[in-house]
């Protein structure tokens, strides 16, 4: 008999059997780590603390993180989400999202006398600092990322005269530089590690003296979640990724699962998005979630799968995350 542990999910239990074993009964492989990263946790708590301290409304420029459930929950608590600072009443409180903003946004907020609380992920801030540093040294900066993504817009805004966006492998051939001795690549933090390295390889073939960033720009959580998916995907006929469609790191997890051997992979916002037809003939389902997804949504998916007979849950653990980021100074408790 397979040892199990109660998960608090009706009809489901955790099995200690290794991934390599293939039980005949239906099962779920549950990726660990998954869900909230340190930057998302900090950003969501920033809005919650701002509401507690100042009361509603607290304005938030763009979605604080790319997850519908999180945004809807905060909106019900009194957060008001806007696209630009011009929509915020003069003198009001505004929170900048985890994805970061360009310097022009800070200027606009100052001109409107807004009380800014910056929830930019510290790992995104690191990339901003790198962009400014290399721009000061007059480098051409090749920013690998997705056009229009808030994080890319913010990073490019730090050095608009020096940054060129490289959006995918096919964009490499369009890149031009002024001095092949002064070229560096930076990246959006939520990309596929494998695709990014493929792009870097092609860039380096064109520009042999291409410099790497001082440290890895793709965040630890993005990498960890992709590694966990790669570990379980070969065992899965189906992988379900919990996350919103505008979440870059969640979309990448679907791609990684398919690339690592899963027969099918789907992105769902919550359990009701699961199509029962996906489960036809499926014995093993992999489950993971993007870095902006609260665990309650994963629990809902596991409950739905348990109702469909997937009552054994086997964790697939590839890393243990302990990183915590301090809240913005304006919201820290006095010591």
From Swiss-Prot:
Catalysed conversion reaction: isopentenyl diphosphate + 2 oxidized [2Fe-2S]-[ferredoxin] + H2O = (2E)-4-hydroxy-3-methylbut-2-enyl diphosphate + 2 reduced [2Fe-2S]-[ferredoxin] + 2 H(+); dimethylallyl diphosphate + 2 oxidized [2Fe-2S]-[ferredoxin] + H2O = (2E)-4-hydroxy-3-methylbut-2-enyl diphosphate + 2 reduced [2Fe-2S]-[ferredoxin] + 2 H(+)
Keyword Metal-binding tagged: yes
Gene3D superfamilies: 3.40.50.11270, 4-hydroxy-3-methylbut-2-enyl diphosphate reductase, catalytic domain
Annotated keywords: 4Fe-4S, Iron, Iron-sulfur, Isoprene biosynthesis, Metal-binding, Oxidoreductase
Residues holding (2E)-4-hydroxy-3-methylbut-2-enyl diphosphate: 66, 99, 149, 189, 247-249, 292
Pathway stated in the Swiss-Prot or TrEMBL entry: Isoprenoid biosynthesis; dimethylallyl diphosphate biosynthesis; dimethylallyl diphosphate from (2E)-4-hydroxy-3-methylbutenyl diphosphate: step 1/1; Isoprenoid biosynthesis; isopentenyl diphosphate biosynthesis via DXP pathway; isopentenyl diphosphate from 1-deoxy-D-xylulose 5-phosphate: step 6/6
Active site: 151 (proton donor)
GO molecular function, one term: metal ion binding
Record note on cofactor: Binds 1 [4Fe-4S] cluster per subunit.
Disruption phenotype: The lytB2 gene cannot be deleted, unless an additional copy is provided elsewhere, demonstrating that this is the essential homolog. lytB1 cannot complement for loss of function of lytB2, but the sole LytB homolog of M.smegmatis is able to compensate for loss of LytB2 in M.tuberculosis.
Pfam families: LYTB (PF02401)
Protein name: 4-hydroxy-3-methylbut-2-enyl diphosphate reductase 2
Family listed: Belongs to the IspH family.
Function: Catalyzes the conversion of 1-hydroxy-2-methyl-2-(E)-butenyl 4-diphosphate (HMBPP) into a mixture of isopentenyl diphosphate (IPP) and dimethylallyl diphosphate (DMAPP). Acts in the terminal step of the DOXP/MEP pathway for isoprenoid precursor biosynthesis. Has a higher activity compared with LytB2. Is essential for M.tuberculosis growth in vitro.
Binding sites annotated in the UniProt record for dimethylallyl diphosphate: 66, 99, 149, 247-249, 292
UniProt entry tagged with the keyword Transferase: no
Residue numbers binding isopentenyl diphosphate: 66, 99, 149, 247-249, 292
Protein's GO biological process: dimethylallyl diphosphate biosynthetic process; isopentenyl diphosphate biosynthetic process, methylerythritol 4-phosphate pathway; terpenoid biosynthetic process
Names of required cofactors: [4Fe-4S] cluster
Uppermost EC category: oxidoreductase
């Amino acid at each position: 008999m397979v040892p199990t542990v109660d998960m608090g999910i009706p009809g489901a239990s955790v099995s200690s059997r290794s991934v390599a074993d293939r039980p005949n009964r239906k099962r779920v492989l549950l990726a660990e780590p998954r869900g909230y990263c340190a930057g998302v946790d900090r950003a969501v708590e920033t809005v919650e603390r701002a509401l507690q301290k100042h009361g509603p409304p607290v304005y938030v420029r763009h979605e604080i993180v790319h997850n519908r459930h999180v945004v809807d929950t905060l909106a019900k608590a009194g957060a008001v989400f806007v696209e630009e600072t011009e929509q915020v009443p003069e003198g009001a409180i505004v929170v900048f999202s985890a994805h970061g903003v360009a310097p022009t946004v800070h200027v606009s907020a100052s001109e409107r006398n807004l009380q800014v609380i910056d929830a930019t992920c510290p790992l995104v801030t690191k990339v901003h600092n790198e962009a400014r540093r290399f721009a000061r040294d007059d480098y051409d900066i090749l920013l690998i990322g997705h056009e229009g993504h808030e994080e890319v817009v913010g990073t490019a805004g730090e050095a608009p005269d020096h940054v060129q966006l490289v959006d995918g492998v096919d964009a490499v051939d369009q890149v031009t530089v002024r001095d092949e001795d002064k070229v560096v690549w930076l990246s959006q933090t939520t990309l596929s590690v494998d695709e990014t390295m493929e792009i870097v390889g092609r860039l380096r073939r064109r520009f042999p003296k291409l410099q790497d960033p001082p440290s890895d720009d793709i965040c630890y959580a993005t990498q960890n979640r992709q590694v966990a998916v790669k570990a379980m995907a070969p065992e899965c006929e189906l992988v379900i990724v919990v996350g919103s469609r505008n979440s870059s790191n969640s979309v990448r997890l679907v791609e990684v699962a398919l690339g690592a051997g899963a027969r099918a992979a789907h992105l769902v916002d919550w359990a009701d998005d699961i199509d029962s037809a996906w489960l036809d003939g499926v014995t093993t389902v992999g489950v993971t979630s993007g870095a902006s997804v609260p665990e309650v949504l994963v629990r809902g998916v596991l409950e739905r799968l348990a109702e469909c007979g997937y009552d054994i849950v086997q964790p697939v653990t590839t890393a243990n995350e302990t990183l915590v980021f301090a809240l913005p100074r304006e919201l820290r408790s006095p010591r």
